[in-house]
Regions:
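Globular "head" domains of long coiled-coil molecular machines
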Residues: 7-10, 33, 37-261
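Extended helical scaffolds that flank P-loop GTPase cores
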Residues: 1-47, 234-305
């Protein structure tokens, strides 16, 4: 659990304890209790995106140190795959109605052959690399040119819930950032989320071509998004680079961006409710004093966040 998680959970629990004897705050206490539980269980989904055959699965396999993910031979077989650490290795295939089918870890190819039947799958692996990046959960995404239904399922699920995106541009196949690629990145940028662009398959290109592709991509991203990060160059053995990208993600800042606005809003709504109550209790001195004490404590918490 990160420091920010601990801090926000502690803040939420303190606010609940302070307000628990104030009847007018019962609804807000329930909301804050749910929010605190959400913070405790929050994962950081990091999708790896790009066109079909841009090297997403190969990159993740190299990071894991073994061939876990099948390399799709056609876009139709692609499905969003979450990779999670667990002592109990298994596959969970989740349908559109949230029902779950459980498979043996060795049945991944069979599950992917029925990709159209599922919304996404969760792959639980006893892999130390996945344990080391927790609470980050890597997601191997369908390519941009996957069937519309598969692509839309992935976008609907992971565009809102993904907190950081790793975007692969195949130097060998795509060579340039297309309008379609820009549209995909704009969906991330418009939500105020960050991405890291990587040019993959550079081992298949001469150095002069790599520099040209990188230069054009950098200019395009600067113009479209004000992108200032360096562009990573990936070959067929770049698992260590992916590991560095993941470990360089500022997860404390991510938790702050996700939850600080919600915690602050909840405390301010409590304050507003208390103000209304104080006005209504202006002739009941003791109740008003109690409400003021609660308000003072909540205001102090807002200030300290």
């Amino acid at each position: 659990m990160t420091n920010k998680q601990k801090s926000y959970i502690e803040c939420g629990n303190k606010a609940i304890n302070i307000a628990q004897n104030t009847d007018c705050l019962n609804n807000k206490i329930q909301e804050l209790s749910l929010l605190t539980k959400s913070i405790e269980n929050q994962e950081l989904l990091v999708p790896v995106i790009g066109g079909f055959s841009s090297g997403k699965s190969s990159l993740i396999n190299n990071f894991l140190g073994s061939k876990v993910l099948e390399i799709s031979v056609a876009p139709q077989t692609a499905i969003a795959t979450e990779l999670r650490y667990s002592q109990d290795e298994k596959i969970e295939a989740i349908k559109d109605d949230d029902s779950i089918e459980i498979f043996d870890i060795n049945d991944l190819k069979k599950v992917e052959e029925k990709a159209q039947a599922y919304n996404h799958i969760k792959l639980y692996l006893k892999n130390q690399k996945l344990k080391e990046i927790e609470p980050i959960v890597l997601v191997d995404m369908p390519g941009f040119n996957a069937p519309i239904d598969t692509h839309n399922k992935a976008i609907l699920r992971y565009m809102p819930s993904g907190v950081y995106f790793i975007a692969l541009l195949s130097g060998a196949d795509e060579k340039t950032i297309t309008k379609t690629y820009i549209t995909e990145l704009n969906g991330i940028y418009a939500r105020g989320k960050e991405f890291q662009l990587c040019i993959s398959k550079t081992n298949m290109l001469p150095q002069s071509d790599i520099e040209q592709i990188k230069s054009y991509a950098k200019k395009t991203l600067e113009m479209e998004f004000g992108y200032s990060k360096d562009i990573e160059l990936l070959d067929d053995n770049s698992g260590a680079k992916l590991e560095k990208i993941l470990k360089d993600i500022d997860i404390e800042s991510l938790f702050e961006s996700i939850y600080k606005p919600h915690i602050s809003m909840n405390l301010k709504e409590m304050e507003s409710t208390i103000n209304t109550t104080i006005s209504a209790l202006r002739y009941d001195k003791q109740d008003a004093i109690n409400a003021i004490e609660v308000k003072s404590s909540l205001l102090l918490m807002c200030y300290l966040m």
